[in-house]
Structure formats: C-alpha cells, structure tokens
Amino acid sequence: MALLLWVFSCSLFSLWILSFMRSQATEARHGTLAVMCDERARILQDQVKVSMNHLQALAILVSTFHHSKSPSAIDQTTFARYVERTAFERPLTSGLAYAARVTHSERELFERQQAWSIRAMNFSSKRPRAEEYAPVIFAQDAYKHVVSIDMLSGAEDRGNLLRARESGKVVLTAPFQLLNKRIGVVLTYAVYKSELPLNATVHDRIQSSIGYLGGVFDIEGHVDKLLEKLAGKEPMTVNIYDTTGESMIRMYGSSNESASGMCHVSTLDFGDPLRKHEMHCRFTQGPPWPWLAVASSYGTLVISLLVGYIFHFTDKWIAKVEDGYKATDMQMPAKDEFAATERISDMERDLKEDALFFDTTKSPSLLEISRLLNHRDPAQNVHQEEQELNLPLEAQDKLKETERKLGRMSKFITKVMKLTSASIRCLPSRFHCFNKKVWSISLLGFLLFILVIGAFDQPYNQPLGMGGEGDNNMMLKNFGFSRGRLLIDTLHGTWTKRGVQSSDTIRVDLRKMTRNNDSSGQQLKHWSSHKSSEIPAVLYVPMNGKQVIVHCNLIVDEKALVNWISNGDTDQSSKYQKETAGIQNRTDKPHLPANKSHKTTVSPWIVLLPVIMLVLLGSIIWRRCNDHRRRVQQKELELLGIMGPSRFQLQDLVAATGNFADENKLGQGGFGPVYKGYLRDQDLHVAIKVLSRRQSCQEQSAQGLREFKAEVKVMTQLRHRNIVKLVGWSDSKKQLLLVYELMAQGSLDKHLYDPEKILTWQQRYQIKFANLFNSTDKIVLDLGSALLYLHHDCEKCIVHGDIKPANVMLDVSHNAKLGDFGLARLVEHGGEPQTTQVVAGTPGYIDPEFINNRWPRTELDVYSFGIVLLEIACGKRPASRQLPNGASSLLAWVRDLYDQGKILDAADQRLNGEFNQQQMERVIVMGLCCSHQDPIQRPSIVQAMDVL
C-alpha cells in the first residue's frame, strides 16, 4: 500500500512539474508575443505621427504665405512647391490635397483664371450666394489612390472637417478601399490664419479657419514591409482594426486569423480621441513540443520511482532478516536445552564412574553445579552479543539524556540510519536482482534530470558587493556583471580633502579606479567609461578606515547610455534601478538586495558532463556488443574451418601475394580486388579475394561483410567439380580474405570478348570425348551442371544470385567452374522463400521479378542462366549499345529475331558460321525460355539440362 501511495505521489508530482513548466513556457511565449506586438504598435503609431507632422508643417506654410492672397485658392504648382518644402523626410502619405473656403465671387474668378470649374458645397438650408462657400481641391498624386478628396461632400468627411477645425488637431476618417485595392485612411487638418491666438477658443478657431488639408495614408502599402522586417524568430500574423463602431473594420492584415490561439491585443493611439484602433498579433504556428518539461517530469518520475524501489526493497530485506532472527530465536531454547541435557548426561555418567573411588554423598551439589554451568537462559543467550557491545555507563547516561531532549526526532534519525545501513549492506548482494532495463532507464532519467537542472538560469542574490581589504582600501566585487556600465555614488562624511572639489564629476576607468577625495558629507559621483568587453571583478577605493555607503546604478544596455554620458546628464540615472551596499567593516561578507532581472551564466560543465557520460556509456555498450558479435562470428568461422577450408594468417597471405603487389592483381570485384598468390607450404597457386573492413562507404562495408560470411558458409558445404574450390579464409581486423583455387584461364567474360582470341563453338558447347569417361570443352553444360547441383543435389537449395560470365571461371582445359558465392542464399527445398531486404545483383542478369518481390528462388538463377546462354551464343553483352536495329537489350533483340523466324541470325558473327546449327538453335531457344518474363513459364534447371 505504501509503495502504491509513493508511486501515485511521484506521478502527481511529475505531472505537476510538467504542468508548471508548460505554463511557464506558455507565459514566456505570451510575453514574447506581447513585447513583439507592442513594439510593432509603437512603430506604427510613429509612422502615422510622421504624416501628421507633415500636415501640420504644410498647414503652417500655407497659412503664413497664402491666406492673404486674392483669390485665396492655390494653383497646383504653388501647392507642389509647398509640399516639397515641408517634406524634410519622404512623406508617408500617398497623396495630399488642400481645400480652401472661398466666396462665390472668388470661386467664379478662380474658375475663369484656371479654366476649370470647382464643385460647390451642398447645404441643407438655402443661403445667400454672397455667403456660399465652395471647397477647392488641389491634390498631389491623390488621383492615383482615390476618385476625389471632396472633403465636404459626404457626411463623415464634413464631420471630420468640422472636428479638425474645432480641435486644431489631425483627425482620421474610417478606413476605406483605395483604387489599388488596399486599405487606407484620410488624415484631415484645419488651416488657420496666421493671426490665430495661442489660447484660441473653439469660436476663434471656427472664425480663423481658411481651409483644410487632407492626406491619404495607405496602411497596407506603407506598413507591410515595415512589419515584415520586424518579424521575430517565430512567424506571426499582425492585424490592425478600427474599433470605433460596433463591428471592427480591418485596416491591415489577413482576414484569416487561424493560428495557435495565443493572441495579444495592443491599443493604438493615432492622436484622434474619437476613433479607436487595435493591433492583434498571433503566432502562425502552434507552441513547440515541451521537450524540456517532458524530460524534467520524466527524469523526476524515474528517479523518484528508483528511490522508492530501493527503499521498498530495503524494507522487505530487513523484514526478511528480522523474520530469520525470530525463527532463530524460537529454535535457540530447544537447541540449548538439548545441548545441556547431553552435557548433563555425560557428566552424570562420569560421576557415577568416579563414585566407585570417591565418596559423593557429602557433595550432592556437584550435579547442581554442573546443571548451573551448562544451562543458560535463552533470552540471555540471544542478547549476549548485544550486551558485549554496550557502552560505558557515562556514555549511556549521555545518550539517554540526548534522546530525552530530542524526543521523537532521535527515534526517527535512528530508524533512518538503520535503514540506510541495511540498504548499503544489502545492495551489493542483491545487485544482480535488479532488472537491467530499470537501471538503464533510471540512468537515462538521472542524466536528463541533471541536464535540465543545469540548463536553468539560477538568479543570484549578490551581483555586486563591497568588502574590506587592508587598512586603507575598500574592495568592490563584481559577482555577475560581464557587460555594461556602472554609476557609483560614494557618500560618506569624514574623508579628507586632497585638492579636488566635492562637486566635481569625473570619468574613471574601472580597471584603474583609485580615488582619494573628500566629499565632506557631499556626494561624489564616479562615472564609468569602461570600454573593454568585461568589467573587472575587483575594484579598490580608498576609505581610510571610515564607514562608506555605496550606491550602485546598473546599466546593462550600453547603447542607452550614449546620449546620457556624452551630454553629462546625471539626472537620467534616476530611471535605472538603484542597489545599495552598506559596509560596516572589512570582515563583513558582501551583501546586496537580490536583482531578479539578471541571471548568472550557466556553467558549461553542467551541460557537458551529462553529455559526456551518455557518450561514454554508449561507447561502452557499443564496444561490448561489437566484441560479443565478433566473438560469435569467430566461433562460427572456426567451426566452418573444422568442416572444410582452412583459416590462414594474414601474414601468410601477404607473403603469398608479395604484399598484394599490383603485378599479382588479377582483377577488381564488386567489393574488393582479386590477387594471385602462391602458398609455399602447400605448393598451391591460389586466387585471393580481398574484402576491406574499412571502406569509404559504410553500407558497402556492411555488404562486403555479409558477402564474406555468406560465401564462407556456402562454400564449405559444396563439393563439385564445376564449382570453384574454397581453399581457406582469413578474417583480420583490417581485411577479410577468401582463398580460392587458381583458375588458369580466368573468367569466361574475358574469353568471350577477347578481340584477339575467339572461343570456338566446340569450346562453348560441343562435347569432344577424349575417352569414354573424360570430356572437355563444354562450358554451357558445365555451368548447367553446377546449377543442377546447387538447386537439387545439396542438402539445402542454394540460390547463387549472381550468375554471369565474370563469375564463370575456366581451368586449363576450359572446364567451367562457378564461383563468387557472395550473394548466395540457402532455401529449403519446396519451402517458401523469405523476402530479402537488399536487392543485389548485376544489371542485365538479375531477374526483373526479383526486383519487385525480392524472393530468392531458383527461378532467379534460371533467368540469369538464360541470359548467359544467349550471351555465349550471340557474343554480345545483355545491355550493349551496338545491338542491331537499335534494340534496347540482347533479350529483346533475340526475341524479335525468333518471332521473325531468323533465330540463327543472332549467332556470334565472329564464328563465321562454324557451328552446329541445331546446337546453336537449341542454346538460343533455351536461353529465351529460361529468361521468360513470367517465372512460371520458365523451365527448371533439370528440364533445361535435359534439352541441352
């Protein structure tokens, strides 16, 4: 029950850690989003204010130089010149317009001068023509964005103009769609006469207004690139809304806000109190998987369960030992009584014998004495060992007094010590009982836990402190600051003045900060102009044995101090956080209030140590597994060596090949070269195939090792005259070597395509009997005989997997022998083949059906045998580019000739017709049958040999 409660508690605690760390990560992520969103909102507000400042500057220019003109309307050229004068920076507005209030007579005069008409303002009530006003619109590129900026034609525009005239501030319209399909707003500002008083009332503003300026602000066009440049490490979407009405109007951003759900809203203040705007920021991706929280909770759970398991096992072991003691205690009285009875009976027998010589009637207590000497109290016997270990009386009295003072705590400590001692004694003897998986998981969890704990940034409580050093110096210690600047204010009352006024403000380098000044109770300010990358750890300030109070202002961001230091504005230091360290004497430890906003740098060893331990553990496990696998392979190869081929030492094969000299190289195989060698002790010429363990490609190296094992395993079971004999092998750490009997004539591939020497048809197929028992020159039949032996005569069916002329070797008499069993596979006779993981073979000879299903069956060898038959008969490679009529392959070309009834035209032209036509036709037809696309339609090797 206690164990289950412990597991439940550990699970709850780990879940709490997971939940807490996830909440912390979510809070930190939301804080990042808030900072990014607020920064974007501030930048957008600044952009709008730039446009507002431009309108205000233009209004001042117009009111100063043009309000007294008659008519007061401005032509395009003059207005453009005013715009250029006010555009100190490139204006962010996409178009500017000016509307002047003119009388009816002035409007008619201006229309005659400019040769175009001005739209009149529509009033709801009739007014005399002398009092009628009309807006005059002059725009600079405004026509590219809006149809017209007729700022008194609509109700909203009219209201904005009136608000701008009454307030004297820039007002905004509702967002609307521009001609370029983007969203924009119009900024409106009133133009007043230059005589407008500073403290003008609303009535004064209305009377003094002479016109209105309007600027089109393209929200999407100007802000899009700006916000894209400020995108953080994590992509986010930004939307801007006008929330003045009941429904929000989107001013910027996509309409689809589907994201992680985490959103932050920043309020935008564009300077118009009647319109409200907001910026919504969302992350486009969901929160990352909390690996740190999962690893921490998992490591805590594993370690807690391991601790609980250890204590549970210890408790069970102690209980078991106590039960054994109790059982022993129950058996001890009977054993003692039996032993005492035996001793008493022996003594009585001796006394009876002695009674013949001595008179024992006067000493009847002798038997009683013997009983007393031999009979022991069981309880006394049990606790005899404990009594021997009793402390002296004084120590016992002190121990009892301590227990009385500590009370229950002493019992708890005693019990814990007993459990710890018992667990330490029992763990070595019970170590083998622990599951290896439990220990592996526990070790991994512990390392993860250490890694997580080491990754935490621990806040420090003493970033800066003052300490005494010597009689006349005070030491300022820097415990955690690596970059930044310090403002040190030293205040004391009894220093002696040494030629420097107390009001001076000086700059000092922290590396050479020695100051002998007397402030006489006033404040002396030391300004740091430290230019190195790190602040020194120790700073000495002379104090002359007096008490000093030091105020330290920490500035982390050096860029923020550029103007502050250069201008000498000491009052700005108040915006930084102050920290005070009071020094009483030189023996006091430094103390400073904690600064939670700064954290220490994580020691790299805390992170590297678990990683190093994991690497070492993994290397040890890999080394042991590798050694075990090598020993198993060694045993297998040694067993194979007993059965047939011999195992050679590497130095013997090096000597046999002349240190693998180039002149002894016979050729290059798929996974290594082949060398010619001579074994002197056996007087035998051999061919040595080298498979290197250390190849550039790990996959090729593994394939070579598999070929080596497969070839040794198969070749030890083969005994046939048409199969190359495996003489031996060697498996050193650097190289794997296979030793074969040397075939004097080399491979069939070499003879088929030798331009100087041509294999005759008799050598290829026809049988010439030297006598009744021996035959020579039958390459086709020898190859078929080898396949017949592999498929039917062996204990297990052997699929060669790579039959081609390069693997058919010829001896002195041109007898063919099949070799290179690196891709061979053992298959049960009549059994279902197992699918192989790797498709290996030679293109042109490999069965297409095997590429699809990967079943190593005998049909695979039959297909390759058919291709070799066609190659022997036709003298052309399977994928030659010199085939007649542009045929894609040898098989397709021969099949086409067979369909045309011209099968003999496929015969090797170099034979010049010197062949038996029936035999040639038989070989070609059988080659086509064996290489049929459908494996079911192919003959078996037995049927093929019957035909051949």
From Swiss-Prot:
It is a multi-pass membrane protein. Residues 70-280 form the CHASE domain. Residues 660-948 form the Protein kinase domain. Its main location: membrane. ATP binds at residues 666-674, 689. Residues 312-437, 623-948 are cytoplasmic. The keyword Ligase does not apply. The keyword Transport does not apply. Residues 1-290, 459-601 are extracellular. It is found in: Cell membrane. The active site is at residue 802. GO terms for cellular component: plasma membrane. One of its GO terms (molecular function) is protein serine/threonine kinase activity. Signal peptide: none annotated. Putative receptor kinase that may be involved in cytokinin signaling. Belongs to the protein kinase superfamily. Ser/Thr protein kinase family. This is Probable kinase CHARK. It comes from Oryza sativa subsp. japonica (Rice). The lineage of its organism: Eukaryota, Viridiplantae, Streptophyta, Embryophyta, Tracheophyta. The gene is CHARK.
